[in-house]
Amino acid sequence: MRIDTVNVLLEALPYIKEFYGKTFVIKFGGSAMKQENAKKAFIQDIILLKYTGIKPIIVHGGGPAISQMMKDLGIEPVFKNGHRVTDEKTMEIVEMVLVGKINKEIVMNLNLHGGRAVGICGKDSKLIVAEKETKHGDIGYVGKVKKVNPEILHALIENDYIPVIAPVGIGEDGHSYNINADTAAAEIAKSLMAEKLILLTDVDGVLKGDKLISTLTPDEAEDLIRDGTVTGGMIPKVECAVSAVRGGVGAVHIINGGLEHAILLEIFSRKGIGTMIKELEG
């Protein structure tokens, strides 16, 4: 038992050395947010990353909590072309849940476990400048990222804080916009030229049939979308990953957030547990 523990530490050592001082952007969502054990393990993983000299930045989602709050308030969601319409009232609820509830819970839990976390949203210091997303028709205050101003993030991480970001952006029209958390995380990672972007999902990674694909180049990932291997909700995640890698991010990891300590298992072991997308070296 003791030698197993030593071997785990020895396996992690070269990765701890390699990533010391590097920035990781982690999208927290899916199973990791819903399962108490996974949620607790996520907090522990972030604290450990911080203590090993890595600079973690968290971007979180919260779709199910928004739906639950709307239900509690007796507001029926409206859908157009399969997408939720975010009118002004819905946007207020989105902001209340993401910024006022989920963000503060994550910050509190990190701080209780020895971190120095600060909660912000994309509106703060114009971190995320957004514009209306129109590819699905007019669905209200759903936005896409127009620009990221990362100065506030540099200030926080240089002063040893862990930024926790709710993906609510500010439009040049002064309106708040709800932004997909994967997209927000990818754009933030690109703006920082982060070493890694880690997307926590509800599945083990990119699958071919029931077999996990451990590594992909951006070109290979796009081929899997074209040939129908990658389908449904995994398509936008893979597209985000490809965009991030081509935008200067060292590597993107798509992993199952429902697996306890998924981040540590992916980052600090040779085999990993998910799919890594990166350019070929050399």
UniProtKB/Swiss-Prot annotation:
Annotated compartments: Cytoplasm
Pfam families: AA_kinase (PF00696)
The UniProt record lists the keyword Electron transport: no
Transmembrane segments: none
Primary enzyme class: transferase
GO biological process terms held by the UniProt record: arginine biosynthetic process via ornithine; L-arginine biosynthetic process
Residues the record marks as site: Transition state stabilizer: K27, K237
Gene Ontology annotations for the cellular component aspect, listed alphabetically: cytoplasm
Protein family (similarity comment): Belongs to the acetylglutamate kinase family. ArgB subfamily.
Function of the molecule: Catalyzes the ATP-dependent phosphorylation of N-acetyl-L-glutamate.
PANTHER family per record: N-ACETYLGLUTAMATE SYNTHASE (PTHR23342), N-ACETYLGLUTAMATE SYNTHASE, MITOCHONDRIAL (PTHR23342:SF0)
Protein name: Acetylglutamate kinase
Organism name: Thermotoga petrophila (strain ATCC BAA-488 / DSM 13995 / JCM 10881 / RKU-1)
UniProt lineage: Bacteria, Thermotogati, Thermotogota, Thermotogae, Thermotogales
